[in-house]
Amino acid sequence: MITILDGGMGQELILRSGGKATPMWSLQALLDAPDLISQVHDDYFASGALVATANTYVILPDRLKHFGFPERQAELMQKACKIAIQARDNHGSGSVAGSLGPLGFSYQPDKCPEIDIAAPIYETAVKQQSEFVDFHILETMSSVKQVRGGLMGATSSTKPVWLAISVDDIDGSRLRSGENVKEVLPLVEEFGAQALLLNCSSPEAITKSIPLLSECRVPIGAYANGFINISDSFNKIGSTVDLLEKREDLTPVIYADFAEKWVDAGATLIGGCCEVGPAHIKELSTRWKG
């Protein structure tokens, strides 16, 4: 059975708001336009998604401190989770996932803190989410150190934890840190993660990478992004996603064609990341749910 996940949140919010990207990314919408977040969740469920991923990716101390309100983490975490829950309840079925983004910055594993610093941060985050979500998902983990720190903290939760790793867009056999993807597999078993996915990488890289997960004992999956590449200038908190260009060739049909290859390689969890929207999820749902 194939489980259809939702698609990207941040880029979809920018598209719908009609404004420019802001340094606070999807957090800006949580503060100023929560109804837009609700609409995105609703549209993903209507497109066939079985999971609403709460808009909590950037609700972490380093991001909040940078923007001047570190004391609001629990409040914002709860607000985002409740929006996802309401969408699930409106739809009448589905699950809610609590997103946990990388510390430091996305795609920049060299900026992540040491494991003994990261683990308690994620432990706090899952405590704030666990009352509301069905499971947590560590996203865009780009090095073995990021994975270990994330899993060490997140698996303190009583709820299941999924792990999603991001790979090099040229060499899909390697994490963005340069380490081999297979180095993550022992950590999945050590910490008891319930699923292992590839995320926020090009569909081509994921197609090369997913066969390397075949030895994993838990369900595997993938959700790619629709960026041309990850610009070197997109490298710090405060950078805006308008530094990243959208691919024009990644139509829903072509994206689903890539997903066919992932399923053939053993994936059972399929969705989308940045620049992959409701139309893409609808095509996935049509192919696998009929």
Provide a role label for each language-model segment.
Residues 1-290:
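Domain-level signal for soluble alpha/beta catalytic cores
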